[in-house]
Amino acid sequence: FAVTSGSLPGGLSMSSAGAITGTPNGVDSDTTSTFVVTATANSATATRSFSITITAQPSGGTISTATIGGTAYTFHKFDAPAGGTFSLPGSKTIDVVMVAGGGGGGESWGDNDTGKGGGGAGGVLVRTGYSVTAGQYSIGVGAGGDSKQVSTGHSDHRGGQGGNSTGFSVVAVGGGGGGGSDNYGSGPGPGGSGGGGGARNGNN
């Protein structure tokens, strides 16, 4: 067996026994290679035309694969704070799991380091069977909120709001910051959306 006209896709080769082996090179768009194979045996010769199509694959993020319930999946994971770009060479149906940043915990004000509220969890959005067309998609990943981002006197040492995560025209909202505690008589700080409120410490 030998390829006598045309060529195999890049990265593939044919042995004299007719076996095609190798890993095809990545392509930016679906690519079809047409070639002619000639087989010779006992002074007889036969030819036949074949074609192989290499399908372009999406790119972006940290890529991994897994088989779940007998179905093979490819995962593209984007991390905070950089996010990234998801490149799709052709229309596909995908599943999207988007997690926003959690809110930061509140901070104590005063001598007693207790009573601060925990930050709220970041929002989670799940979209299955989501149809998207070819293109470049910007993915934003919300970071966790900072501690004591908002401060207005003793009573409000609240944690910062978690960042939103965005992509494919949907938004997962970041968690609210936890309320700060108070040890000086001004009262505990309230928590943001999903964040725990602060507590009053001491007798001042």
Region roles according to the model:
Residues T23-S29, Y130:
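Short, surface-exposed loop/turn segments at beta-strand-coil junctions that are enriched for proline
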Residues S29-N42:
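A short beta-strand micro-motif common to beta-rich folds, especially ectodomain repeats
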Residues G6-N25, V36:
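Strand-loop-strand motifs at the edges of beta-sheets in extracellular beta-sandwich domains
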